[in-house]
UniProtKB/Swiss-Prot annotation:
Stated family: Belongs to the chaperonin (HSP60) family.
EC id: 5.6.1.7
Consequence the record notes for mutating L289F: In strain: L2
Catalytic activity: ATP + H2O + a folded polypeptide = ADP + phosphate + an unfolded polypeptide
Name of the gene: groEL
Entry's Gene Ontology cellular component terms: GroEL-GroES complex
Protein name: Chaperonin GroEL
GO biological process: chaperone cofactor-dependent protein refolding; protein refolding; response to heat
Induction of its expression: By stress.
Record-level Gene Ontology MF annotations: ATP binding; ATP-dependent protein folding chaperone; isomerase activity; unfolded protein binding
Amino acid sequence: MVAKNIKYNEEARKKIQKGVKTLAEAVKVTLGPKGRHVVIDKSFGSPQVTKDGVTVAKEVELADKHENMGAQMVKEVASKTADKAGDGTTTATVLAEAIYTEGLRNVTAGANPMDLKRGIDKAVKVVVDQIRKISKPVQHHKEIAQVATISANNDAEIGNLIAEAMEKVGKNGSITVEEAKGFETVLDIVEGMNFNRGYLSSYFATNPETQECVLEDALVLIYDKKISGIKDFLPVLQQVAESGRPLLIIAEDIEGEALATLVVNRIRGGFRVCAVKAPGFGDRRKAMLEDIAILTGGQLISEELGMKLENANLAMLGKAKKVIVSKEDTTIVEGMGEKEALEARCESIKKQIEDSSSDYDKEKLQERLAKLSGGVAVIRVGAATEIEMKEKKDRVDDAQHATIAAVEEGILPGGGTALIRCIPTLEAFLPMLTNEDEQIGARIVLKALSAPLKQIAANAGKEGAIIFQQVMSRSANEGYDALRDAYTDMLEAGILDPAKVTRSALESAASVAGLLLTTEALIAEIPEEKPAAAPAMPGAGMDY
């Protein structure tokens, strides 16, 4: 077993503080409209330029193992906030440092760390309740654009694109961010359900130029097994041919005689048909086929449910206004399923998302929900250089997450103003705490609430304490606009923060800072000293 180095009490806390401060100093310069960039060296390729707090935090690794523990714990604050709300990572880091630094001062002065933590937790609950009270729901396209613009570092182009995407696909829709080939940043909307499986034969294409198969007013056959023989398949094909409507077949696979028959029918100018493989794998495939069945108002023909392909009839088939199949993907537009069944399916998927503990499963469920309920929007980020594109993509990601958070829990006056407006409520709560150290813990949170505003002001070259006093003396929604160096009504000016982001930042910061304050010992491995390399033999330098 490797020997360990142990630090106790005051020495341990000093090491943690140094690690926390080192990481926070690197992250907090990015806060606010006048926040600076951080350039990160990469082992390959060009350096990364970013203003994203969590990206900066993830890159910090300190040489001193004990200091590194403090840095890693605060890194966790940024990561947890990013996971919960997708934005607000810099605010969370600033709050964590403020709570820990002030808490440490009190622990050193003799306060009980456990009581301090209890006081911090109680104060955070009061502030979170107040945040929920003062938040207002997002109602207009304009407000969504404002939230996205602020989160994208005041880039109105990005803000408007995200607002447009949200409007097109709805709050359950999926917005993905990709790198574009050119200079322009553009928005593509894929309406209806789209999955990445194309036709099984190019003979199915109806448009030779685009190489797409377009079926109008189509029937949809959904089967969860392979189709290879034509015998079982023929009865339903004859019924479809008699109906005169085109047919989309989705099955695990279609091969041999069955595929050959469909291709020959297509070449000879028979009824329009297209065959595609089912999307997904395993249990996820079955769930996606059920989604398609509900969307189109058809049935999943499955032998597990006692159904056989040979007994299938027109009533079991789904219906869609339009189906577009390319070489690589399939889009079903305006499936004619029942609205109630579709809503029930969406609610069921939402419940699964809440219950799931796996990030991968959540992501896949979210994709299914988006495809069922709204559609998919793709924002393709373009820029003149790769470095600029990556930096811009980071900002688009932040803005997208902030917008989703705003729709979920509403909006607050931005620029750190909302936390300042919670100070009177917390002051009124203090006398209710009878334990003196718990009261000190609550006062630590009280003081920390002004830290984000002070940091925004400092990054704009102003004195944070003076700006704080000015904002405190003003009415509810009035705050400091660092971009224009003016005091204004933040809601009217469109300087907004999502309530979920502010709440998550405070909760994550207080949680980790509280743990650090109650730490009394640090254990780290003693780094092994590697022997110096032997000097080169004479003549080994090859200097002829």
